[in-house]
């Protein structure tokens, strides 16, 4: 009879320590070190590179419920943050399975090497279903994720750091995610066998100013695909400076952090923009900013919405859409003032997902209609906004669908 090798387990090289003292051990991936952040879970099956580079995830550790992440590697085309060198996005990641060698014709770099290059700390080899269930029952926790190849950790110190972190409430992260200076965007959406295109100067019919709270590239591409030249301006740009650019419309972008904190400087600007009668469109944090600007309130959610399979009802059409979401705060529907209508609602929990000002060309949605990753059910919202620009120019409306 041959002897069998004794049962062995790998020494933990990474840890997730929750604020309540829970310690989860795993195998480290990506960058080494430690970081305090909020833990959330994302239910999308694809698009991990877009998710991890979404600036809205700044200050968060993303747990992927899909077990196999990294199979198709990474590339330079799927990055979503506007300035990749700044590496704005998720600060930590948690996977069920080890990262395998990539197998895809578009793969340029292994996900582990990509995480290292971006400074993202990761942990794999844990029961992500159990962690997701914990978050679902208890809410998104503050935590510390740590990675040491030698497996040396001061657990008590990590517990203290996790407990001491104040969390996302009251935190203005848009100031970190925003661009440092103004820029012009002309890249159009990706086309099979052609890649991304460029909107020529002669083809730009409309001028949109994007207030950048942490904007995603695919949002800007969809504007360019509808013949909009986009000028991206930093989050703290004044209404006077925005109007001096003579835009046909203004876009309020997505972004991270507590909307109430960002609203300290953004809300007065948006209120002045509303008075200008220009068309205004907001997404995600931009939606929350608009809500605050009209007098509504925002609130921290129990676990947030993060995924590409969320059902939302559009009251303006009566249709249900499957959309991509990524937010931990929401506009309180009950706080919407007279003259402001709720246009969309989540069919998961009834939270607000859209609003418009009656009698003004101003509207916003909580979800991500640019579908990166995710379904394209809500692409019509970009055409709805462009139709407001066309109306001001006396042009016929585009078909929304």
UniProtKB/Swiss-Prot annotation:
Region of interest (CPSase), residue spans: 1-203
UniProt-annotated catalytic positions: 284 (nucleophile), 368, 370
Pfam (any one): GATase
Single GO MF annotation: ATP binding
Pathway: Amino-acid biosynthesis; L-arginine biosynthesis; carbamoyl phosphate from bicarbonate: step 1/1; Pyrimidine metabolism; UMP biosynthesis via de novo pathway; (S)-dihydroorotate from bicarbonate: step 1/3
Gene Ontology terms: biological process: 'de novo' pyrimidine nucleobase biosynthetic process; 'de novo' UMP biosynthetic process; glutamine metabolic process; L-arginine biosynthetic process
Keywords associated with the record: Amino-acid biosynthesis, Arginine biosynthesis, ATP-binding, Glutamine amidotransferase, Ligase, Nucleotide-binding, Pyrimidine biosynthesis
EC main group: ligase
Binding sites annotated in the UniProt record for L-glutamine: 56, 255, 257, 285, 288, 326, 328-329
Annotated ranges, domain Glutamine amidotransferase type-1: 207-395
Reactions it catalyzes: hydrogencarbonate + L-glutamine + 2 ATP + H2O = carbamoyl phosphate + L-glutamate + 2 ADP + phosphate + 2 H(+)
Gene3D superfamilies for the chain: 3.40.50.880, Carbamoyl-phosphate synthase small subunit, N-terminal domain
Assigned EC number: 6.3.5.5
Assembly, per entry: Composed of two chains; the small (or glutamine) chain promotes the hydrolysis of glutamine to ammonia, which is used by the large (or ammonia) chain to synthesize carbamoyl phosphate. Tetramer of heterodimers (alpha,beta)4.
Similarity annotation: Belongs to the CarA family.
Record protein name field: Carbamoyl phosphate synthase small chain
Organism expressing this protein natively: Agrobacterium fabrum (strain C58 / ATCC 33970)
